[in-house]
Regions:
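FMN-binding flavodoxin-like domain, especially the glycine-rich phosphate-binding loop
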Residues: 56-96, 100-103, 145-161, 171-277
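Short N-terminal or domain-adjacent regulatory/targeting segments
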Residues: 97-124
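N-terminal structural module
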Residues: 277-300
Length: 300
């Protein structure tokens, strides 16, 4: 009674049938975090790693709530997670026991692969998230028109969030899930509308990077939203800013529609190219579009 054993990184402890190895994993997601590996049953006790939101008695897909958990809880510390994954790769792991969520016993490669994707800030899927706020409905109308343009150009996935009404944590999760993000908001007190301000702050806090980003701004006199949004994301790494910015003066006009058309084309150029290539492969009439100089040789 009263005895304690202080372990260090790499320390081992024999419990008779079980042998434990302790591995420090600072900032995943607390400074003092360590994980424990039981070499007998090949179990990794992963602390906050591989956790998820949700009740254990609810049958649901692991990926969505685990992604939302990762981005919200651990997402800022991708480099630290990458270091932990390198250690995990040296172990024979057959069971993962996180502090939050179900025990993982099958298809562990799937979970580890997702953690590698998330912690390296690599887009998980091709697609476009459009996150917006609207005061009088004009920005919402612009977003609706813009989304239709994206869909018509073959974008494989378009996800839209009204940040004043939808789940902010889900919007944040999807911003990291997909490859491209469009932000649309109004100028507000020489800044941006509060819900958009909150959303972009969360993006920056969680190390948002390696994405293509486009901006749609609205304002009655002197729109500043695009400038403010870009400044807020200025410290984020590997952001590919679209050449086109949509600048709306209160309500959408033809110039704005042309700008949205240009932005949609810029976002969807690779999708358009893929669709054209597929269409050409499936076009049987192409067999008959043969240039001059073709001779038909027959034998008698």
């Amino acid at each position: 009674e009263g005895q304690k054993l202080e372990v260090e990184n790499g320390s081992t402890l024999s419990l008779g049938n079980h042998n434990l190895t302790f591995v420090f994993a600072p900032m995943v997601h607390w400074p003092e975090v360590m994980v424990t590996y039981d070499s007998t049953d090949k179990v990794l006790f992963s602390a906050d790693g591989f956790g998820k939101f949700g009740a254990l008695d609810v049958e649901e897909d692991w990926d969505d709530e685990a992604r939302r958990y990762f981005i919200g809880i651990v997402g800022k510390y991708g480099a630290q997670v990458q270091r932990l994954l390198k250690v995990a790769a040296t172990l024979d792991i057959q069971i993962i026991c996180p502090l939050h969520g179900p025990v993982l016993t099958e298809n562990l490669g799937h979970y580890i692969s997702l953690y590698d994707t998330w912690s390296s800030y690599t887009p998980e899927e091709e697609g476009i998230v459009v996150a917006y706020t609207s005061v009088y409905g004009h920005t919402k109308e612009a977003v609706n028109q813009f989304v239709e343009k994206l869909k018509s150009k073959g974008c494989p996935k378009v996800v839209v969030y009204d940040l004043a009404r939808d789940d902010m944590s889900q919007a944040l999760s999807d911003a990291f899930r997909y490859s491209k993000l469009v932000l649309a908001t109004t100028t507000y007190n020489a800044g941006i509308y509060p819900f958009m301000n909150d959303f972009i702050t969360r993006l920056a806090e969680h190390n948002f990077q390696n994405r293509t980003v486009g901006l749609i701004e609205n304002g009655s006199w002197a729109p500043l939203a695009a400038k403010v949004m870009k400044n807020m994301l200025s410290e984020c790494k590997k952001i590919n800013w679209l050449d086109t910015t949509v600048k709306i003066m209160s309500a959408v006009n033809q110039e704005n529609r042309d700008q949205m058309e240009a932005m949609a084309s810029e976002l969807c150029k690779e999708y358009i190219a893929k669709n054209d290539e597929l269409a050409n492969k499936n076009d049987m009439t192409a067999l008959f579009r043969i240039g001059y100089g073709l001779y038909v040789v027959t034998s008698i």
